[in-house]
Swiss-Prot record:
Gene (UniProt): trpF
Record key words, sorted: Amino-acid biosynthesis, Aromatic amino acid biosynthesis, Isomerase, Tryptophan biosynthesis
EC number annotated for this UniProt entry: 5.3.1.24
SUPFAM superfamilies reported for this sequence: Ribulose-phoshate binding barrel
InterPro entries referenced in this protein's UniProt entry, alphabetically: Aldolase_TIM, PRAI_dom, RibuloseP-bd_barrel, TrpF_fam
Protein name: N-(5'-phosphoribosyl)anthranilate isomerase
GO biological process: L-tryptophan biosynthetic process
Matching Pfam families: PRAI
Family: Belongs to the TrpF family.
Organism: Shouchella clausii (strain KSM-K16) (Alkalihalobacillus clausii)
Length: 217
């Protein structure tokens, strides 16, 4: 199971995530309280051991030129599109940047159909909760009973599917029985606006223990 810690927006966050067991470190380059500036990210990463991590740049309905400009910095391994971008736009981003591109899809009755439209184009998916509060990082979760449908579609496409939205150390155990490809966590590992070492440690312990047990059945 992969772990992605998103919404890193200060040096301390980067250091905490880099010292954790996460696989991906996410940075928001869209309008958000966690939005970061490229020069700051460059400075943070330059002083951090990133040898075992991959970086993800998150955009929401951004222009192709801006995404390409950010990608050319070579600070990021993955581009994540978190808005209403089309399959054609995602393909254009891939062609222009030569990066892995993930598509975030907000859970709804039409979400599976949207996911199917990106088959053969998206390199991965993040299934998030649809919320009036924002595109992501709201702390709200969707009905996890729907996860198997997304997992099945991910298997059919041969792509990984990460689950996002309202995941915390207290409820991560509930995800164990779904054996998801990965978790995308932001507000659930924060305290006073910063990524919390204690919350990350607890989440990793809970997820690790219960996923190990589940996978031995």
């Amino acid at each position: 199971m992969k772990l992605k810690y998103c919404g890193l927006h200060q040096q301390e966050d980067v250091e905490v995530a880099a010292a954790s067991h996460c696989d991906y470190m996410g940075f928001v380059l869209a309008n958000s309280k966690r939005k970061v500036a490229l020069p700051d990210v460059a400075q943070w990463l330059a002083t951090t051991d990133m040898s075992t991590k991959q970086t993800v740049a998150l955009f929401v309905n951004e222009s192709l030129d801006t995404i390409a400009q950010v990608a050319s910095s070579d600070l990021f391994d993955v581009i994540q599109l978190h808005g209403t971008e089309t399959p054609a736009f995602l393909q254009a981003v891939k062609d222009r940047t030569q990066k892995q591109v993930w598509k975030a899809i907000h859970h709804s009755s039409s979400a599976l159909g949207i996911m199917q439209a990106f088959a053969g184009i998206a390199d991965g998916y993040v299934i998030d909760c649809k919320s009036a509060k924002g595109w992501g990082g709201t702390g709200e979760s969707f009905d996890w009973k729907q996860i198997p449908s997304y997992k099945e579609e991910g298997v059919r496409q041969g792509t990984q599917v990460l689950i996002a939205g309202g995941i915390t150390p207290e409820n991560v155990v509930e995800l164990a029985r779904y054996q998801v490809d990965g978790l995308d966590v932001s507000s659930g590992i924060e305290e006073n606006g910063k990524k919390s070492v204690a919350k990350i440690a607890r989440l990793e312990q809970e997820a690790g223990v219960h996923y190990a047990r589940n996978n031995t059945r």
